Amino acid sequence: CRNTIVRYMKCLKKITNMAIAKEWMRKDPFYGYKMEQDETDPVFLTNNELQAIMNREFDIPRLELVKDIFLFACFTGLAFADVSTLRPEHLEQDNNGDWWIRKGRVKLERRRKSSSIANVPLLPVPLAILKKYESHPICLKQGTCLPVVCNQKANSYLKEIADFCGIKKNLTTHAARHTFATTVTLANNVPLQEVSAMLGHASTRMTQHYARVMDRNLKDNMNIVRSKMGL
């Protein structure tokens, strides 16, 4: 599909950029070439699926850890890279005693665009997870808030978690951020502009895609109702 082609072309472009920087190539073969991807719907959990994971306790430590990391992202909207680099200095308490995450997004910082800040009030679920791991040896050694495993391992373990919880979706770390944007916030009538601010989006245009997905899902569900009732 076009998106797969674009993904490979982006990798190739990085290589050619490196070659140009080292003067191995004189001209940019990608000059004037536009990479356009097809819009795809993000994978996210429904409320029932989210509750299924929350209510499941694992005897296997690696699964319990990844479950907690995933739920933390579901209730904060942080990308996996931001969760793994979250440090105590990114946590702030306001005058009312409530805790917030105020953190520049990692992806944008690497591009030297640190103006995009994830600004998220902490709900009881992520607060409890932070408390659970505050004395974890890895956290104490690295100065991080959570002992996050690598993305590849996390995605592998999430597939096991999905199987245990009877979830048929392709569960990855990306699904947590998508779940926050849809099931946790927009589905509970949090204004689009506020969701955009918490996600650290540069504009609400980036967030509107989630709202369109919610509308399509609602329409599909109503079509099922119409079919069952013979309307």
Region locations from a protein language model:
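Basic, Lys/Arg- and aromatic-enriched nucleic-acid-binding interface segment
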Residues: 2-10, 21-80, 84, 188
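Conserved tyrosine-mediated DNA breakage-rejoining catalytic core shared by Y-recombinases
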Residues: 34-43, 49, 85-131
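Catalytic-site neighborhood detector that most strongly recognizes the C-terminal catalytic loop/helix
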Residues: 37, 44, 105-107, 127, ...
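DNA/chromatin major-groove-contacting recognition/catalytic segments
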Residues: 56, 115-118, 212-231
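C-terminal catalytic core of tyrosine-transesterase DNA break-rejoin enzymes
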Residues: 71, 75, 81-82, 160, ...
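Short, polar N-cap/turn motifs at the start of nucleic acid-interacting alpha helices
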Residues: 90-98, 168-169, 189-209, 220
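Active-site/catalytic core of tyrosine-dependent DNA strand-transfer enzymes
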Residues: 121-168
